[in-house]
Structures are given as structure tokens and as C-alpha cells.
Amino acid sequence: MGGGWWWARVARLARLRFRGSLQPPQRPRSGGARGSFAPGHGPRAGASPPPVSELDRADAWLLRKAHETAFLSWFRNGLLSSGIGVISFMQSDMGREAAYGFFLLGGLCVVWGGASYAVGLAALRGPMQLSLAGAAAGVGAVLAASLLWACAVGLYMGQLELDVELVPEDDGAASTEGPDEAGRPPPE
């Protein structure tokens, strides 16, 4: 499949991003033994971060769009594979075995795309300038799309498996006069 280089980059960014959040929070100090060299004292103590430029916003927007495009590409491939599985299932008995393979391939594409999107979103939330709520909404949308796909495939496969008509055994006690339970006339 290739493209393994970006996983290393995402892992590095995730380590850099979450390194501080995994450590216990430091207690605020009010001077004490360290004097004016303690954190929170000095000319930059109350300084705010520099304002975000238009170039930074454009970069963040492009990164978000590229990230979403990658997920949509995986999801499209999963839908395409599932559609081929549906067609294969309808063709012949030999196609039924192949259809399960196509459904599995579609599921792998959908799961891989959703997982890589969620991991990338968590790792690149800072450079994308996304709030926690925005990232959670993105992951929720991906989960909803994946669950919709899984439900559609599950219902379709269940419908195909239940397509067998059960014929009750005729022990001679049933009368053939008059309509049956469904209201159909008796066969002639």
C-alpha cells in the first residue's frame, strides 16, 4: 500500500502534542524559595500567543480538506467494493463466495479510512486549528457514516440469507378448498 512515512510523522506529532498532557499538572508557585525565577514571573508571564495570520488559517483549512479527502477516498473505495459484492452475489453461486470477499474488503476500507481519520484528527488537531468539539464532531460524523455502511451491508446480507422460502410439510390434513392464510386462491 505504501505511504507508511506519514504514520511515522503522525506518531511524532502525536507524541509532541500530547507529551505535556500526559504529565501531571504542575502546581502554581507563588515565589517562595525560587524567587523571581519561578514560572509565572517575568516580562512574558501574561503575554498572549501571537495572533493567527491568514496564511496559518489557509494552511489549517488545506490540511483539514486534505485529511477529509483521504477519508472520503477510503470510504468511496469501501462503497465501491461493497457494490461489486452486491452485483457478484446476484450473478451465480460461485459469485456468492466472491461477494463475501468484496464485502470484507469494503469493510476493511471503511474501517481503515475511519481509523486513520480519527487518529490523524487527534494528532493534527493543533495544526488544523480545530477545537475539541470540532474534532469530536468530525469523529462522530465518520462513526455515523461507518455505522450506516455496516447497517446497510448487514441488512442486505441478512435479506439475502433470509430469502429462502420455507414450505410447510403436507401431512394430508390440510384442506385445499378455499383461500389460504394469505388470502390466495388454491392452486388448480
UniProtKB/Swiss-Prot annotation:
Main localization, broad class: mitochondrion
Locations listed in the record: Mitochondrion inner membrane
Coiled-coil portions: none
Membrane-crossing residue ranges in chain numbering: 102-122, 135-155
A Gene Ontology cellular-component term: mitochondrion
Positions of region (Disordered): 21-53, 168-188
Tissue-by-tissue expression: Expressed in peripheral sensory neurons of dorsal root ganglia (DRG).
Stretch forming the transit peptide: 1-96
Knockout mutant characteristics: Homozygous knockout mice for Tmem160 are healthy and fertile and display normal motor function regarding coordination and locomotion as well as similar somatosensory thresholds for mechanical (tactile) and heat stimulation as wild-type littermates. Homozygous knockout male mice show a delay establishment of tactile hypersensitivity and alterations in selfgrooming after nerve injury. Conditional knockout mice lacking Tmem160 in sensory neurons of dorsal root ganglia (DRG) are healthy and fertile.
Domain of life: Eukaryota
Residues recorded as bearing Phosphoserine in the entry: S48
Keywords per UniProt: Membrane, Mitochondrion, Mitochondrion inner membrane, Phosphoprotein, Transit peptide, Transmembrane, Transmembrane helix
InterPro entries named among the record's database cross-references: TMEM160 (IPR026801)
Topology term for the membrane: Multi-pass membrane protein
Family according to the record: Belongs to the TMEM160 family.
Official protein name in the record: Transmembrane protein 160
Biological source species: Mus musculus
Gene that this polypeptide is encoded by: Tmem160
